Every structure is written in structure tokens, then in C-alpha cells.
Amino acid sequence: MKNEITVRAICSKNKLINILKNKGFNLIDKFNVKDTYFINKNKKLDEITLNNFFKEYVLLRHIKQYEKSSFEDYYDEFKITYKTKNIASNGDIINQNKYDCKIFNIIDGRKILIALGYKELFTISEEAVIYYNGKINLEIKSVENGDILLELETNKKLDTIDKLKQEIRNLDIPIDESDFFVKKAERKIKDLLGENND
């Protein structure tokens, strides 16, 4: 079971990429994602909290995957992704699971989810690049709300959240260390629930 940390960068994407390149990181992947969030249609918005929303939800994903040879040509992928997260009361993600199913197109995927009893809530778009230094993959996400997020997943050597936190601190890059579990959908959910004061 994999886990991850996601932190907010406190600099521009270009500055962040330059810092990583200077530290020996190289671009290994590039893709854009348009995620549409679905939850069980029987869930009432007034009964949802931020943490229990993330316990179980489904994404309808349109991925623009760039060819690794040049990162210019691309092809489209479509997926339904089922996600579960075990979240502590303070918002830390204890563990999580993800199950992907490739589909042929978004229209039919939406029809299937609605037929299975899900309702559509909102869509979030992001541009993502992954950099690798021979040891770790660092994913940089440029989210439509302006956030620049960095994601680091557990692997054989970095197999705990504490090790991930230490690794990203050791890189000495400009990040907000007040939250290691930033959720890109959090602002949208708070808007839905009427909790956003930003």
C-alpha cells in the first residue's frame, strides 16, 4: 500500500523546476489531467465533512499524456479511478488506495457512474511534470486555482511518511511545511459546503 505527501510550493513553477534541475533532477514524465469528482448520490452535502468526503470518491479522468521522447506529442487516456483514504482527525492521510479502470471515452464513463448511483460534483484541471534524481520521483502539479503542489510517494527506501517529510526537507526547496497533506480538491469542497473563507 503506497502513501504520499503533498505540499504547497511557495515559489513559481519555473523557479521550482530550475531548483530541481540544479540539484540533478531530470524530466521523466509530463501530462495534463482533468478530474471530475463523483460521490454516492445518496450522500447529502449538509452531512459531508471535509475529511469524510475523501474517505471514498470516484474520479472520471481525462489525461493528456505526452510522449516521453520529446514531451511535445501526446495522446489521450480516459479512466475511472476509485479512491479511498484513511484520514486522521488532524487531516493527515494515514493510508490510501487507488483503483484505475481504463475506459474509451468520458461520455460513456459519466453514464456508467450515474447508472451506478454516483452524482457529479465538480471538475479540477492540472498540469503535471515528474522529475527524477536517481532516487526519488517528485511530481509538480500546477492546479487551476493557482496552487503549485509537490507530491512525493513512498518507495522501498522511503517507506514511511516521516521519511518522505525528511527527504523533501533535505532538498531545501521553498515549500509550506505547515501541511504535508494538501488536497487539491479541498477548496472546491469547502466552496460546496460553504466553509471557504479564502
Locate the predicted segments by residue.
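Strongly charged, low-complexity linkers/loops
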Residues: 137-143, 147-149
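Intrinsically disordered, low-complexity regions of eukaryotic proteins
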Residues: 6, 141, 153-155
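N-terminal strand-loop-strand beta-hairpin
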Residues: 1-135, 174-198
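A generic structural motif
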Residues: 146-148, 153-158
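Long, well-ordered alpha-helical scaffolding segments within enzyme catalytic domains
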Residues: 158-176
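Hydrophobic, well-ordered secondary-structure segments
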Residues: 110, 149-150, 161, 165
